[in-house]
């Protein structure tokens, strides 16, 4: 009986202990359900995270001190990467903004009141930035979201910002090589140190070396920059509203065009806005800002040159091998939608895994959390899920929520076909816009006056400051998908003029809080002096007619029945262009002017919509 009791006691003990003893034996690890990472209880408590910072040595010296620049990096990882030998992949964000930025006071920007083809007035220099230096945490971004789900989160300040050495170059090579160095360090190919100038090394023994990058705006640009280096270990990037060419950010078709909301900004202004590390400030300001940027960005003509070509990531796509989930808003007039499409198009042509997510809003806006989760789980954890299955393009329709996109075979919609529309006379009121090409339509003249906004001109029933051509009222919705292209034959009474084009839907929707898809369908700008070449402008001969063709922005929008689609041609766009004195006259030859719009269903769909 005594032996039986002893046996029972042992058995009871075994069944009482598993919740503690067996749990202690089981190591924490990522959890996957339906192809997605889940919150791991052992990773959830921030008190159990290891947070450290360090400096990673790069392969460049951008501040002229004779030493390789080091980038300030922070790391947040579950303690199990230290106590249990667990290795996890990395989600990495790099930014020039982490330590703070300069003033947004427009008095330090370039004055938009500038006559065309003239030297601008010197601008005021920014007051020094008072950096926000936090150690060991550079940023808390993405930490609460991804560390509990089985990732290590890494941040770095880009060159010349925060505690990172070097100079900001705003799209220069060092801004690509800096995140490359961090990824190299995560894979044991570069050195990390405990201090910016010491020799005590830090090694990344706690990671698998697989890295995904993400971020918005400038923080979305840097994943593209890193990917163009072809660095091993960077498996996937999810850029949101990235600036992929600084020429396309500050110029359009030869025209000086400011990003929406930042009138007077140029690349040297952005340099001042982000240059938060005061080390070597005088050298960086003199060599990078004044000599390289102001010396070559050309605020007189706006031509494309070697300076701008060196800051266009489309020119560096050859080595790229990371997968791409591109994200943008069709109504982003800060970083316009062409920035994302041109890179997506190039990656698609390379045959790399890629998809694109577009919403109808403005600047920023991540893809749905489930979509990001699946992409990171697939490429960083190796989970076999449906991240790459199904539609190539996910587009949020006009009245849907951002996390409820509609899938399409691709963007542009493969069913979209070009429909060419021709203007008929009507100035100073409204002209027509039709698929019927008629000769002898004559010429119409308008006068530039930057005092009037584009929206006021579009709403005006009578004005001599724009030309406005309107289709018949739509009897059915029209689905536009792709990139409109316009050809204008024009003459000017001066050697230079701004040229702006809007597509709008009429009647104009009056609302104290309009939706992004209300009213303005698309926009485009160009310098008529660049009618032959983007790299060499040519002063216009007053009275002589020139033909210029250029694209508007990528778009996917459904224009509802009851609306009319209108083409507005005007000169200075007060929210984007320079502001010359009013009075320049532009004359448009209607016989030589047309716009091609991409309509899903092509001419048949268009004919049904306008009743023909």
Task: Set out the residue ranges of the language-model regions.
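Catalytic-loop region of hydrolases
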Residues: 25-115, 130-131, 140-142, 431-456
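C-terminal, loop-rich substrate-recognition/catalytic regions characterized by aromatic stacking residues
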Residues: 27, 35-40, 366-612
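Accessory cap/linker subdomain of secreted extracellular hydrolases
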Residues: 27-30, 40-41, 59-61, 68, ...
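Structural cue for short, hydrophobic secondary-structure segments
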Residues: 91-96, 155, 185, 568
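Conserved alpha/beta-hydrolase
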Residues: 147-163
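Short beta-strand/loop motif that positions the catalytic acidic residue
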Residues: 320, 326-328, 332
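Conserved alpha/beta-hydrolase "acid-adjacent" motif
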Residues: 333-339
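Catalytic histidine neighborhood in serine/cysteine hydrolases
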Residues: 347-364
């Amino acid at each position: 009986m005594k032996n039986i009791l002893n046996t029972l006691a042992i058995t009871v003990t075994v069944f009482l202990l598993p919740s503690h003893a067996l749990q202690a034996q089981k190591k924490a690890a990522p959890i996957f359900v339906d192809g997605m990472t889940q919150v791991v209880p052992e990773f959830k408590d921030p008190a159990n995270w290891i947070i450290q910072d360090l400096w990673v040595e790069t392969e460049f010296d951008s501040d002229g001190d004779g030493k390789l620049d080091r980038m300030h990096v922070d790391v947040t990882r579950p303690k199990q990467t230290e106590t249990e030998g667990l290795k996890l992949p990395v989600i990495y964000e790099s930014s020039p903004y982490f330590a703070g930025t300069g003033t947004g006071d427009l008095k330090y920007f370039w004055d938009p009141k500038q006559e065309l083809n003239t030297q601008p007035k010197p601008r005021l220099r920014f007051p020094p930035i008072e950096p926000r230096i936090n150690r060991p945490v550079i940023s808390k971004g993405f930490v609460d979201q991804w560390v509990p789900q089985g990732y290590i989160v890494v941040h770095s300040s880009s060159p010349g910002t925060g505690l990172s050495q070097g100079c900001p170059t705003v799209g220069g090579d060092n801004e690509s090589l800096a995140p490359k160095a961090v990824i190299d360090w995560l894979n044991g190919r570069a050195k990390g140190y405990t201090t910016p100038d010491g020799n005590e090394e830090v090694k990344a023994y706690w990671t698998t070396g697989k890295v995904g990058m993400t971020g918005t705006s400038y923080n979305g640009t840097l994943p593209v920059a890193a990917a163009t280096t072809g660095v091993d270990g960077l498996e996937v990037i999810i850029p949101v509203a990235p600036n992929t060419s600084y020429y396309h950010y500050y110029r359009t078709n030869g025209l000086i065009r400011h990003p929406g909301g930042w009138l007077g900004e140029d690349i040297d202004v952005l340099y001042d806005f982000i240059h938060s590390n005061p080390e070597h400030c005088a050298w960086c300001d003199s060599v990078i800002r004044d000599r390289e940027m102001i010396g070559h960005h050309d605020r007189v003509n706006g031509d494309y040159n070697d300076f701008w070509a060196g800051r266009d990531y489309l020119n560096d796509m050859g080595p790229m091998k990371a997968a791409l989930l591109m994200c943008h808003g069709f109504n982003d007039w800060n970083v316009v939608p062409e920035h994302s499409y041109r890179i997506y198009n190039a990656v698609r042509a390379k045959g790399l895994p890629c998809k694109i997510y577009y919403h109808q809003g403005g600047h920023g806006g991540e893809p749905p959390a489930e979509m990001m989760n699946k992409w990171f789980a697939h490429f960083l954890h190796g989970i076999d899920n449906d991240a790459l299955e199904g539609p190539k393009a996910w587009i949020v329709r006009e009245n849907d929520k951002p996390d409820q996109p509609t899938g399409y075979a691709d963007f542009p919609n493969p069913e979209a076909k070009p429909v060419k529309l021709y203007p008929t006379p009507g100035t100073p009121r409204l002209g027509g816009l039709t698929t019927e090409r008629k000769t002898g339509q004559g010429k119409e003249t308008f006068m530039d006056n930057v005092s009037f906004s584009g929206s006021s001109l579009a709403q005006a029933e009578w004005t001599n400051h724009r030309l406005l051509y309107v289709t018949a009222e739509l009897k059915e919705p029209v689905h536009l998908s792709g990139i409109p292209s316009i050809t204008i034959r024009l003459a000017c009474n001066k050697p230079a003029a701004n040229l702006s084009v809007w597509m709008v839907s009429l009647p104009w929707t009056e609302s104290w809080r309009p939706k992004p898809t209300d009213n303005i369908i698309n926009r485009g700008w160009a310098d008529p002096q660049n009618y032959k070449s983007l790299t060499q402008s040519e002063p216009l001969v007053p009275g002589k007619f020139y033909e210029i063709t250029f694209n508007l922005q990528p778009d996917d929008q459904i224009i509802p029945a009851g609306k009319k689609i209108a083409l507005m041609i005007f000169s200075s766009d007060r929210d984007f262009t320079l502001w010359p004195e009013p009075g320049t006259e532009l004359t448009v030859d209607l016989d030589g002017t047309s716009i091609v719009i991409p309509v899903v269903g092509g001419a048949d769909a268009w004919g049904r919509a306008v009743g023909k």
